[in-house]
A protein has these predicted regions:
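Residue(s) in the substrate-gating loop at a strand-loop-helix junction
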Residues: 148
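Short, small/polar-rich loop/turn modules that mediate ligand/substrate recognition or access, typified
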Residues: 181, 186, 243-245
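Substrate-binding pocket helix/loop in short-chain dehydrogenase/reductase
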Residues: 100-101, 105-113, 213
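Conserved glycine-rich cofactor-binding loop
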Residues: 11, 18-19
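Alpha-helical segment proximal to the catalytic Tyr-Lys
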Residues: 129, 178-179, 241
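Active-site helix of classical SDR
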Residues: 124, 165, 173
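Short C-terminal tail/terminal secondary-structure segment
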Residues: 2-4, 233, 244-259
Length: 259
């Protein structure tokens, strides 16, 4: 039972690791002894986080556009120039689009689906050889897909493609979880509720909306970095080695209270 929750010495990739939930997870990984690669399209934000995280451990930044296979292939080649295996892949990079149903544009559907659903699938496919090399029966490699409570319950905003992509990602997690287990790779998902991030900044800036959201959360607050980091650490440690194809909701009880 000793060191059951340790992730020290592992190597991880966190996509979208320069902000929001991705940055929260990446920072926790670095602080807990994980060699962590973070990716983002935005070089300045990426370098800022790399500099901050590197004060506590090893963090490498790679600028990447993962909306298509060209960017995924480029990232894979660069990672392979450093690593022969990977222990953890966090599919966190994502985007959203809000518009009324009557005016919702095709580009708002395609862009969100490409980044939120297609990218995790093809990233996992591409990195399969490196994940297989690392996986052991008693401590499998891990793929963690960052979903959302919006993929489970009715969203507050008209984010049709976002909620659909996250719902599909939850089912993809179940599918891949069952299929990848034979390779000693555990695939799970985290469905966060409301955390401080760029995507939820409109809530934080609106006092009335913020109060309305918190009123719906039994634990009367927004999520903290420790809340999401603790879940990610658990899912990447030996403590979760028999957890596969599952989605853990981290929302302060919001879905439970909704009935």
């Amino acid at each position: 039972m000793k060191n059951l929750f340790s992730i020290q010495g592992k190597t991880a990739i966190v996509t979208g690791g320069s902000s929001g939930i991705g940055a929260m997870i990446a920072e926790a990984f670095v602080q807990n002894g994980v060699k962590t690669y973070i990716t983002s399209r935005k070089a300045d934000a990426l370098e800022e986080k790399r500099g901050a995280f590197s004060l506590d451990g090893e963090c490498i930044a790679i600028q990447s556009d993962l909306s298509g296979n060209d960017g995924i292939n480029t990232l894979y080649k660069e990672i392979c120039s450093y690593e022969s295996k990977i222990d953890i892949l966090i599919n966190n990079a994502g985007t959203a689009w809000a518009s009324s149903f009557e005016d919702f544009p095709e580009k708002g559907w395609d862009k969100v689906m490409d980044i939120n659903l297609k990218s995790p699938f093809f990233l996992t496919q591409k990195f399969l050889p490196l994940l297989k090399k690392s996986g052991k029966e008693d401590d499998p490699s891990r793929v963690i897909n960052i979903a959302s409570i919006n993929g489970i319950t009715h969203p507050l905003m008209p984010t049709y493609s976002y909620s659909s992509s996250k719902s599909a990602l939850i089912h993809l997690t179940r599918h891949l979880g069952a299929d990848m287990a034979r390779n000693n790779i555990n695939v799970n998902a985290i469905a966060p509720g409301f955390f401080p991030s760029k995507m939820t900044s409109h809530i934080a800036k609106n006092e009335a909306l913020s109060a309305e959201v918190i009123k719906k959360i039994p634990i009367k607050r927004m999520g903290s970095p420790e809340d999401i980091a603790g879940t990610a650490i658990y899912l990447c440690s030996r403590a979760s080695s028999w957890i596969c194809g599952q989605t853990i909701v981290v929302d302060g009880g919001m879905i439970a209270a909704s009935g």
